[in-house]
Amino acid sequence: AASDVYKRQAKGSGMIHPNMGTMLCFLTTDCAISPEMIKSALLDTVRVSFNRISVDGDTSTNDTCVVLANGLAGNTPITGPGADYDTFFAALRHVCEYEAKMIASDGEGAGRLVTCTVQGAETEEQAEQMAKAVVRSPLVKCAMFGTDANWGRVLCAIGYAGADVDVSKVDV
């Protein structure tokens, strides 16, 4: 099985939008895993963690996320899909989602961490489109920072997200 030993370090809390921005993240594990499988795991994990955070709406050209595996765990090397890969992927995703939330909560001027979960969308892409519209919305940010639960602003952001939405089924 994949090692339970992970080390992590991430930094960056400005110019984090939409895809990592000027953040740095270095991850290490003792797991034995092939370069192809670790690359696949990292790309899929970054897509659903670091590439989904927004702090200030500005994008930087500089970002890095690296994962290194030294193989010292002594596990049978992960060279393809299967239970061991799924375990490794789940652990890597957990670590990256945690780091992404920490970066967003430490954002320049951030007083709150807002997460948006979309359920019932026709596709993951539409759900992501709606969620990003909500968390990027300056009006939603003002409402959250001012502790004014103005749900109309959330609905407005969902409406202009560009996804197919049946407004009669929306519940905020």
Where are these regions (language model features)?
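A glycine- and small/hydrophobic-rich beta-loop-beta segment
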Residues: N70-G146
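Short acidic, glycine/serine/threonine-rich loops at helix termini
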Residues: H17-T22, P77-T79, A127-Q129, C156
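Internal helix-turn-beta structural module
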Residues: E128-K132, R136-V172
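Short, small-residue-biased leader/transition segments that mark boundaries at the very start
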Residues: A2-Y6
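Mobile "lid/hinge" segments at catalytic clefts and subdomain interfaces of large enzymes
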Residues: G14-G74
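Signal for well-folded cores of large energy- and translation-related assemblies
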Residues: G14, T28, L43-V46, F50, ...
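A short beta-alpha structural unit
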Residues: C65-V67, G111-T123, W151-A161
